Structure formats: C-alpha cells, structure tokens
Swiss-Prot record:
Start and end residues of each stretch annotated as 2'-O-methyltransferase activity: 246-428
Any one GO cellular component localisation term in the record: viral nucleocapsid
Subunit relationships: Interacts with VP1. Interacts with VP2.
Protein's name in the database: Protein VP3
Top-level taxon of the source organism: Viruses
Localization per record: Virion
Reaction equation(s) it catalyzes: a 5'-end diphospho-ribonucleoside in mRNA + GTP + H(+) = a 5'-end (5'-triphosphoguanosine)-ribonucleoside in mRNA + diphosphate; a 5'-end (5'-triphosphoguanosine)-ribonucleoside in mRNA + S-adenosyl-L-methionine = a 5'-end (N(7)-methyl 5'-triphosphoguanosine)-ribonucleoside in mRNA + S-adenosyl-L-homocysteine; 5'-triphosphoadenylyl-(2'->5')-adenylyl-(2'->5')-adenosine + 2 H2O = 2 AMP + ATP + 2 H(+)
Molecular function in Gene Ontology: GTP binding; hydrolase activity; mRNA 5'-cap (guanine-N7-)-methyltransferase activity; mRNA guanylyltransferase activity; RNA binding
Broad class of where this protein is predominantly found: virion
Entry note about domains: Contains a bipartite N7-methyltransferase domain, a 2'-O-methyltransferase domain and a GTase/RTPase domain. The C-terminus contains a phosphodiesterase domain that degrades the 5'-triphosphorylated, 2'-5' linked adenylate oligomers produced by the host cell in response to IFN stimulation.
Stretch list, region 2'-5'-phosphodiesterase activity: 693-835
Family of this protein: Belongs to the rotavirus VP3 family.
InterPro entries (alphabetical): VP3_Rotav
C-alpha cells in the first residue's frame, strides 16, 4: 500500500483509493495502525501528522507528503521505493512505453546497434544509474527519479538461447503488462546500495554470500567486502572435457562485445578486491572504445589508464599507441591488467589470420607473465584463443557471452597462479570449453562454508536455501552468527513441504520457529527495508518465492513498535471479512467458538483471544513483516521498548488461546503448514513464559452484585473472577494487586442477558464486560509469579442453581457491583473491598 499525505481533499476520484482523515482523538501510533489496516492500495491521508508518516515508513509502508496535484498524479499511478531518510522517491513506472521507447541505465548499450532490432518506431533512452538522469522530469519538493528500465530484459536476452531480439523484447514487454510488477527485484537495487553503504560505515569486516551479476554495480565501491560465490572454472577442470571443433554460433543480433569486456574487467576487479581489499589502478591494453568505463564511473571513482591506437574516450589517462612487452615496467603495483589486444583481420586470408591470432595470444600471455613476475597486489585478465597451450592449472577460465561464439576465451591469473604448475591443454579441449560453457557470474570466488564467523558481519541474500546446503547447518549458522542479514525461503506451501522447486534447483523451506535466535529480527522484505531507511508502495505477495529476512545484532531489536512491528497485521483479515466471509465478525466469532466460549454477545469488543497472534499465524503468508516471535519474547522478558501509542499487553494465556484457534482454523482449511506453525508458536510461548495453572485452586476472587435479575436458590450468587493456587503467606501480595486494580474493577460495565445450563444440574447466568480487566489482572499476577487462572478458558458466569432449570433470555441488564472479595475455597473470606 502507499500513503499519500495531503493537507486538503481532492475533487478527483481514483480507483482502489480510500480517504483517511487524521483522528485527533488517537495518537500517532494508533492512526498509523488504523491506516496500515485499510484494504485499498492507495490511501489519501488528510490533515496528516508527520510523526504518523514516520511510523509508517519505518514499518516499510511508503508514506509521502504531497503538496501539489502533479505529485499526487505521479505517485498514485505507479509503485515506488521511498528513501525516507534522504527523501528520494524511486519510481517503478513503465508508462514510458507510451513514448515508444525502452530504457537503459547502462551507457554501453547506447553505443550498440540495438535500435536496429527494436519494435518499429521505437527508440532507446539512457536514464543514468537507477534513473538518476530522469530527476529533471519531476519538479517536486522531494527528489524523484524513475528507476524502471529494460536492462533486466536486455541482460536476460544476452544469456538466453534466443536470437531474435525484437520478438524477445516484445514478449517481455507483454509479460510486464500482464503480470504483477516484480517489485522486490526493482527495489532490490536501491536496497542493496543503501544496505551496504550502511553496513560499511558500521562494521569493519563484512562477508557477502552468493552475489549475482545484478549486484556487481553495488560492490564496485566496496573493495573491503569479502565475497563468496560458486567458485571459478579452473584450467585443471578442463580435464573432464572431450575435444571439439570450432562452432561459430551467433548469440546476439546486436553487438554485445562492450558487455563482454565490461563484465570481464569487473571479474578482474572483484578478484583483486577479494585478495587485497583496495581499489587498484586499472590498466587496459587494446582498450578502444570501452564506452562501458562511463558506467563504472557512475558507481565508483576508479582510475583507468589505457593503451590503444584508437580513442578510449572515458579513460583517465589514454596512450594513443601500441603497448609492448618492454612497457610492462611502466605498470605499478596494486593494479589490475586487462589485456584485450587483437589486430583487425582486414583482408587477411584465414590461415594468415589464424597465425597472427596465435602469435598475439602467445604475446598476450607473455605480457601477463612478465606483469605478474614482479611487484605485489596484481591480477591480470588476458585474452586467449583456442590453440595448443600450456597454462597454469589454477588460472581461472572465463567465457562471458559475446556476439558470436568463435575461438576466444579469457584467463584470470594472480601472481601465485602465474608461478603454479602448467598443464598442456589441447586446442580441441579449449574449443569444447568455449562451445559449451558460458560464465554467468562476475563473482567467481570460493563457496561459503556454513560456519559461524566471530568478527564478521555476514550478508547472505537469497543464497543459503538451496538444497545443496545442509539444512541443519543453515539453521545452526543463523542461530549462532552474532551479526548478520540472512534470508531463507519461507515455507508458504499448504502441505508443509520441506523443500520446493525453483527454476532448475530445489530450495529448503523454513518457518520462523525453525530458528532459536536471541536479539534477531525475523521479518519480510518490507520489514527489512524499514530498518534500513526505505519503504515500499507494494507489499510482497505470497508467490511461493518469498523469503524470511533475519537481522542479527541490530540495535533496533528492542524497538518493538518501530521496526518489524504489528502494522498491517489485520489487513488480510479485513480484506476477507469485509468481502468474502459470512459476516465481518467472522474472526471474532471463530476465535471464541474454537475455544469453547459460546457467549458471542459483544464478541467484537470483548474477545477472549489475541487477534494479533491469530492473524499473524493464519495469514502469515500475506504479512510476516510482524516479528511474532520477537514480540512474544520481549513481552515475556519485560524488555519491550514502546515509543508511544495506547498499548495493550496481552496476557500469555490469550496468546495460547490464539494458537488453539489458529490450529482449529488450519484443520478446517487442511493447511498443514499453519497447523505446525501454530503448534510451534504455542510451544515457544510455553518456553519463554513460565505459565502455571491453578487447576487445583485453593483461593478464588468473588464479585457480589447488588442486583441479580433472575431467580436463584444458591445462598450467595456471585461471579468467580478467577481462581488461585497460593500459599497463605502470599495472600498479602494478592491483596496489594487487588487494591491496585480497585478502581478499574468497579468501573467494569458488567451486564447479563440470558441463562443456560453450564452442565447437568449447574444453572448459570452469562456475564459480559469483564474479560479485558480479567486478562489485565492475570498479567499483574503473572508478573508477581502468583498462579492465577486455569488451563481451560475463563468463561465468566454466575451460578444460580445446582439443579436443572429452564433457560431464559432478558434484555441486557447492568449488574452493579456490591463488593469484591478474596476467599479460601471451603474456608473464610480473607479480604473484601467495596467501592
């Protein structure tokens, strides 16, 4: 949902939009809670409070102040990610298709012939990183840019088996127009940038697990971050390949040579980051034109020094000349060298050309060896061709997509590799490598071992759920890693499947109860955004590919009502109850009935079950930004930090009742996952709370009324307002609490309206209006370790007779309290109080 804050109403009506007027009788937190549970997508928030907007944004719900109608129109027609700290709105708006254009934030794409293969009459527009160049389109009080581009489709095409780009991009545009927006993917670029800038400023050692190509821009400016991936393809790995011949297959209609060079240079750069954690000088031989250097400089202040007889316009220092092996002495330490020398073929015949290429390959390799033979902190990426060669067995082979598969591949070596054992590799084996293997990731670092790191902050986004990881080892890592942000696939199946298919692999599934974390926040993508200063306008949908975000070591753990809080917890319930269910009271009715409380009079205002916990369990697929386990734990330890708002703390028994209701719901829905989740949350409640039951009571609290509107034959009809199991020495402690609650007890609006047979020969009258105070009293006794209340649900009633009677119904009648007392069962009254 998105909240657009206005000082005055608007005349125009928008679809899926609701108006909320700030309620001055409620504080900012209550207003935020009510807004978050509205069911429309767009909320026009009138007479707004800035504090309420802050609360919503911290909760991951995008809430933006609007001063002018053009702002309203811009934000209401599309989704966006909002940086509420720096006041920047990143639109995810594809309406630019109506201008017959596709967009890119990659400058190198504009230098290709891609426009020859677009839809008729269409053009390509460059918009800068994350749409930075579109800021001039929006003259707003906040910074605004459109981060939507078609780079995802362009890159997918490059790695696909499709050749016809026009058909491919047409299909992708149609898909985009007919399916829901992949909001997490779009906002993820904004999130990654914000996340790692924050972490680098707070932590000296950071480990990142499982990055993919889409992350490479973020890490260009963070050389200190240690990367772990799936490992490289080494020269020694070619021993598994059979010999093949030249294939000559075209991969792309438009020229993607710039992309190939781009990612190979980044491959090289990340390799030296991994070893030395500093930004190097980047040397390039055969550099022209390298338009992609412009893209690199959008993300980081890296320095390029280049050699080529042709121009390299974005180089910091370009030598318009050839580079010879004798020039290697000009190259400094703490550098990377990218050798891409290849003479143009011009009119040479095939045999002559092949001889030239092989000679240049040997020359390139010799330059690389000489560069690596002296000095320190060096890595080299060198262009090779398929030929009989001796190569270091530990050197890394690269074959990123290029316009055509021919004879070229690349080799990355560091100083140690260049001195390692060399193996003879036949030309046919190298052709087999070129023909069959595409390097899909610029991150080729070693795999991460699932073990706790003492001094590092571990980030593992979408990397650990794969079933090639041992599930128990993943759980152990998350439980024990002190500082981390780790995601795992949430189990949102209905049959409690332990693993689910994803693309060509399987992922383990998890629930929050699988982890035993202390001081860790377990939330959704939306909830995690709020922690790092971002919010989003479109909540995550239960697609089957959703993840738990687990933040360990965060200083926001105790801020329970600020981050990963209960905002939107009733939204799914409202959507169902006010549209599909038998009555809008269905949730209240079901919760009472499933706990054997059959008095439904006033059930919507006096419910015996925690609606928060119930909704968090049965609708967890729709909103798990609320960290239920943390909420339970902080209440159980009395460590919850509440910033504001009228806050009702549930008694632990109310939480138990909620689990029982959710379990009943799950059985009716045949939802095995919710069934397990409910059982495990109930077990967790019993673990963190020391709940004892007065199932063998020796004292009770009684309430005598001045008026009983029914006939009765018991001596003193009264309401048993809870039973206790205490020693006589604890009576004074009970009396202290009763005196503390005196005013609230006598203020209760107690009513009755019918009689019924509680069981055979027990004739009783119903009592309404006391449950809220009962649970508050329960909490007070619990905190003083006084055993109060039984394991079965408290059903307030007045016993009228110990014989069978005809039930009667009367108009709701108020019962006036005469006095309240504490009495020993089968004994004397030890305390009483009147108003």
């Amino acid at each position: 949902m998105k909240v657009l804050a206005l000082r005055h109403s608007v005349a125009q009506v928008y679809a899926d939009t609701q108006i909320y007027i700030h309620d001055e009788t409620k504080d900012d937190y209550e207003n935020a809670f009510f807004i978050s549970n509205l069911t429309t997508h767009n909320i026009l928030y009138l007479n707004y409070s800035v504090k309420t907007l802050q609360i919503l944004n911290k909760s991951g719900i995008a809430a933006v102040e609007i001063q002018k109608m053009d702002k309203l129109f811009t934000l209401i027609r599309c989704n966006f990610t909002y940086d509420y700290i720096d006041d920047v709105v990143y639109l995810h708006d594809y309406s630019y298709y109506t201008n017959n254009e596709i967009r890119t934030d990659q400058h190198w794409v504009t230098k290709t012939n891609i426009e020859d293969y677009l839809l008729p009459g269409w053009k390509l527009t460059y918009v800068g990183y994350n749409g930075n160049d579109t800021r001039g389109h929006y003259n707003f009080s906040f910074k605004c840019q459109n981060a939507a581009t078609d780079d995802d489709a362009i890159i997918e095409y490059i790695y696909s088996n499709e050749l016809d780009f026009q058909n491919f991009i047409l299909k992708k545009i149609k898909e985009r127009m007919t399916t829901s927006l992949p909001i997490a993917r779009l906002s993820n670029r904004v999130f990654r940038d914000k996340l790692f800038k924050t972490l680098v400023s707070d932590h000296s050692k950071i480990v990142n697990v499982g990055p993919r190509n889409e992350s490479m821009f973020t890490f260009l400016d963070h050389p200190s971050i240690k990367q772990f991936s799936n490992g490289p393809y080494l020269v020694k790995d070619t021993i598994k390949l059979k010999q093949e011949r030249w294939l000559g297959k075209r991969l792309s209609q438009f020229d993607i040579g710039q992309y190939k060079n781009y990612v190979k240079c980044i491959n090289n750069l990340i390799s030296i980051y991994d070893m030395y954690h500093e930004k190097p000088i980047i040397y390039m031989l055969g550099s022209a034109p390298s338009y992609w250097i412009h893209d690199v400089k959008q993300y980081s202040n890296l320095k390029f020094e280049t050699w080529d007889p042709l121009d390299t316009p974005y180089s910091d220092l370009h030598h318009k000349e050839l580079f010879y092996i004798s020039d290697v002495t000009k190259l400094k330490d703490n550098s990377i060298l990218y050798i891409d020398i290849r003479t143009d073929r011009e009119n040479a015949d095939w045999k002559t050309w092949r001889k030239i290429v092989e000679e240049q390959t040997v020359n390139n390799l010799n330059i690389a060896y000489k560069y690596l033979s002296t000095g320190k902190a060096k890595v080299c990426c060198v262009k090779m061709t398929a030929m009989d060669l001796e190569l270091p067995i530990s050197a890394k082979l690269l074959h990123h997509p290029t316009t055509e598969i021919r004879s070229e591949f690349y080799l990355i070596m560091d100083i140690w590799d260049s001195k390692n054992i060399k193996r003879f590799i036949p030309k046919g084996v190298l052709y087999s490598y070129i023909n069959n293997i595409i390097t899909e990731n610029v991150f080729i670092q070693q795999p991460f071992k699932l073990k706790t790191l003492r001094n590092e902050y571990v980030v593992a986004l979408y990397a650990l759920s794969n079933d090639f990881n041992n599930r128990e080892d993943v759980i152990k890592l998350i439980n024990n890693q002190k500082n981390a942000l780790i995601t795992v696939r949430i189990n949102n199946t209905f049959k409690d499947e332990p693993k689910v298919g994803f693309k060509d692999i399987y992922d383990w599934t998890f629930l929050p109860t699988d982890f035993e974390t202390n001081e860790s926040i377990i939330t959704s993508y939306d909830g995690c955004l709020g922690v790092f200063g971002l919010s989003i306008s479109l909540a995550s949908k239960p697609t089957g590919n959703n993840h738990l975000f687990m933040l360990s070591g965060t200083n926001k753990y105790f801020n329970m009502d600020q981050f990963a809080n209960h905002m939107s917890i009733s939204r799914r319930s409202h959507q169902i109850r006010f549209s599909e269910s038998a009555t809008s009271y269905s949730g209240y009715i079901f919760r009472d009935l499933s706990n054997n409380n059959f008095n439904l009079i006033g059930t919507n205002v006096e419910n015996s079950v925690s609606g928060h916990v119930y909704n968090a369990l049965i609708y967890y697929r729709y909103n798990y930004s609320f960290d239920l386990k943390r909420w339970i734990y902080l209440h159980s330890t009395n460590k919850a930090s509440i910033e504001g708002g009228r806050y009702y703390e549930h008694a632990p028994i109310e939480l138990i009742y909620a689990c029982r209701s959710a379990r009943e719901f799950a059985k009716l829905q045949d939802d095995l996952t919710v069934l397990r989740y409910s059982n495990e949350i109930e077990n967790y409640i019993n673990k963190v709370y020391s709940i004892t039951y007065a199932d063998d009571p020796n004292y009770f609290i009684g309430i005598k009324f001045k008026n009983i509107p029914y006939e009765y034959d018991v001596k003193v009809p009264h309401l048993t307002f809870g039973v206790l199991n205490i020693s006589d020495s604890m009576v004074p402690d009970v009396v202290v609490i009763l005196k503390k609650f005196k005013s609230e007890l006598f203020r209760m609006d107690v009513t009755t309206s019918y009689t019924y047979m509680l069981s055979d020969e027990i004739y009783v009258a119903n009592v309404s209006g006391v449950l809220s105070t009962y649970f508050k009293l329960y909490n007070a006794f619990y905190k003083e370790q006084i055993t109060f209340g039984q394991s079965r649900m408290f059903i307030p009633h007045i016993t009228l007779s110990f014989s069978n009677k005809k039930v009667v119904r009367i108009d709701s009648t108020r019962l006036n309290i005469d006095f309240i007392y504490l009495r020993k069962i089968k004994g004397d009254t030890v305390f009483d109080m009147a108003e």
